[in-house]
Amino acid sequence: MKHKILFFIFFLILFCSLGQTPCSNGFAGEYPCNNYDLLSHIPVSTLANNSGNPEGSDIWGWTDPATGKEYAIAAMTNSTAFVDITDPINPIFLGRLDSNAGNNYWRDVKIYDNYAFIVADNVGNHGMQVFDLKKLRDITTPVTLSSDVIYDNVTLNANLIANDRVNDLAVII
């Protein structure tokens, strides 16, 4: 019986550590690191849609003030992905918001007052997508999301700056 318990504990520890890769000699597995361990990984092929040759371009985060859940918001060349990272060893891909105007080299995301503001460069009339992050609370399986607002009076945007202290959002062209 003692050996069965030790065997069970060994496999429980092994199972719980899957996906975790320590940073060693500047790498966590195949990924460069700087004294940060890799806790888990979701490939771009899961996060982005299949249009073009998707790559990652930016990442931001949001903590839901009502639930305390933490989310990663990953900008891809063709979409923006939303991942529940409350348990960083077991992240949950919630869904994606596709680009408003095709693929681009750079997409930027900033958070202000529970909203994600998303811009892109080199895609014509992308404008600025606005997404209510509180919608993430009710998602149980991955979905394709929609913008709540598309502000189309701006084009070819490379960056956003959000300043919570003065309630200001600046679009950098």
Where are these regions (language model features)?
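Bacterial Sec-dependent N-terminal signal peptides
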Residues: 1-22
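Feature marking well-ordered beta-strand scaffolds used for ligand recognition
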Residues: 19-173
